[in-house]
Structure formats: C-alpha cells, structure tokens
Amino acid sequence: MFSRAGVAGLSAWTLQPQWIQVRNMATLKDITRRLKSIKNIQKITKSMKMVAAAKYARAERELKPARIYGLGSLALYEKADIKGPEDKKKHLLIGVSSDRGLCGAIHSSIAKQMKSEVATLTAAGKEVMLVGVGDKIRGILYRTHSDQFLVAFKEVGRKPPTFGDASVIALELLNSGYEFDEGSIIFNKFRSVISYKTEEKPIFSLNTVASADSMSIYDDIDADVLQNYQEYNLANIIYYSLKESTTSEQSARMTAMDNASKNASEMIDKLTLTFNRTRQAVITKELIEIISGAAAL
C-alpha cells in the first residue's frame, strides 16, 4: 500500500524525535548531577567559611599582645642601629607559612619573595640557607632549592601558635650548627580582614649583636645576659611572625571560601536556568509529537 520511499521517510520522521528526546533526557540527568555536586561543594565552602571566621576572631584577638612583644624586640635592632657586617656572608632566610591551603595566595606570596631574596643575596656573594615554617612553603621551594634547606617545620597552622612553639623553632635554629651572621624572616602581616602584606624583618646572631658599635656603650652587660636576651628576642620575633601569619591566613581563607560560595551560587543559578530551558524544550517536542500524531489520524 505504501511505497518503499514512503515507508523509509515515515520511519525517519518517527525515529528522529525519539532520538532527540533521549539526548535531552541524558542532558537533564547530567545537569541534575552537576547541580547536586555543586550544591554539596557549596555546603562545604560555607562550613569552612564559618570555621575560618571563628578561628580568625580568636587569631585577631591574640595578635594584639603578640604584636607588642614582636615590635618591641624589633625595636632593639632599629634603635641600636645594628647592621650585619659587610665581610660576613652567611645569611639565614626564614619563611613563615602553614600546613593548610585553600587560602588564596598566602603561601605563594611568601615563596615568591623568598625566591627573589635568594637570587639577590646569591648574586651579592652571600651564602644563603633556608628555613621553612609550614609544609606548604617547603613543598613550593624544595623542588628548586632543596640543597639550600637547613630545616623545615611541620604541624604549623593546625592549632593557634604559642610562644612555646616559637621557642622550639628558635632553639632548633640555634642548635642546627649553622652559624649565620644575619638573617631575615618573611611573613604575611595582617592589615584588615580583606588585606595583608608580605613583610621582611631582620634577625641577627649573638656575635653580630655583641660586636655592634652601639652596644659598646653598655660595658656592664654580662655575656650570659646578652645571650639569654638574644635568644628570647629571636623567639619573640618568631612568635610575632607566627601570629601575624596565622591571622592573615584565617582572614584569607574566610574570604576565599566566601568567594567560592558566591561562585557556586552563580553556577547553580546558571545550571538551573539551563535545566529549565532544556526541560521546556523536551515538553514542547513531546507536545508537537502528540499534536502531529493526532492530526495524522
């Protein structure tokens, strides 16, 4: 009754909408799966933001007294005009970060400045040794400067740093066997909840401080007293840098998680719109098929 051409044409016309419908249904499943995944990630980022906000509030509260001690210790080098001798070449470079990520450019900014300092000091003929406080800074620099690493410290940033932690780091540096003449400690200084600045502060060895011209006016200072004060001074500066770095890290993580949550919301809105449009297209095609079939009858 029907010709072969007519049957072939009818078969093609009948199968094409079914293929499109299957394709659209698969697309809807993919979109639904992506929406579910993004919503789960958004829950995680919001939770991490809340945790970071609580840790940031504590870190900022503890930073104020630590900053007083740190700036007081640094004032000694400034007021006494202590400088590293030009003929001495041993330099110690300390980078302060932590073991945890998801906090923006906190760790990479420290690594970038340390690499720049290493290049500058090496070009000036200095012998540079590195100390990494935190596993992140060690992971970044160890690939390119493994031969210059003196010591690296882990388990940093999981708990609020204490003066005891700074004392352990200072004691480890003094007992490392590397008799540096001067050094620098690089850390992120907290400025506001959305801002921090990578800073570098000087540190000096006991011999450098004792042989400074400005220290000669204090004839009655005992050598043991000066040694104890210098060790305490080093621990103070490390403690100050740890507190500054921790506060900067928590504020940066809070900002990063807030941005991630906002980006997730935007993606959810776009995918929801795409889902609705695709579903509407499927419904429209099904209605066209029904109407066309009814008209053919």
UniProtKB/Swiss-Prot annotation:
GO MF annotations in UniProt: proton-transporting ATP synthase activity, rotational mechanism
Membrane association type: Peripheral membrane protein
InterPro entries in the cross-refs: ATP_synth_F1_ATPase_gsu, ATP_synth_F1_gsu, ATP_synth_F1_gsu_CS
Transit peptide feature range: 1-25
Name of the protein in its database record: ATP synthase F(1) complex subunit gamma, mitochondrial
Pfam families: ATP-synt (PF00231)
Underlying gene: ATP5F1C
Membrane-traversing stretches: none
Keywords: Acetylation, ATP synthesis, CF(1), Hydrogen ion transport, Ion transport, Membrane, Mitochondrion, Mitochondrion inner membrane, Phosphoprotein, Transit peptide, Transport
Keyword Mitochondrion assigned: yes
GO cellular-component term (any): proton-transporting ATP synthase complex
Modified residues (Phosphoserine): S146
Record PTM N6-succinyllysine, positions in chain: K49, K115, K154, K270
Family indicated by similarity: Belongs to the ATPase gamma chain family.
Domain of life: Eukaryota
